[in-house]
């Protein structure tokens, strides 16, 4: 082995676009796995601030506990700047219910709902209905497809009726 030759790892040999795609796919599934991934090596860590990664980063743990996002302000700011639906939902919930900025942050919940975030669709629909914007609220509610009966329930439905 030649001591003057610098060896590169297989990961370093991959194109940066592919590395960003890997990090983005991991981020969609789990924020914890994303965090571990970007800490694992500098090549993957370089993709941490990529627009595609931040737009699709799964913030499900923060969606469940929005007030805990105060511990993660930097990643929240980055995700908001890249139109991450989860980040908009979290900001909207905090500002709407906790800080009482109803008009401004109904907008953030709306962005999240339009981005397909299920909790945001429900919350936005309910808030619109409560504000008297009935048709708009019904439109968002219909996106949840609750009116459709799943096939498995149709099969079970007849057997479980109480008479």
Curated annotation (Swiss-Prot):
InterPro entries in alphabetical order: At1g67623-like, At2g35280_TPR_dom
Q: Where is the F-box domain?
A: 8-57
Pfam families, alphabetized = TPR_27
Q: Under which name does UniProt file this protein? A: F-box protein At2g35280
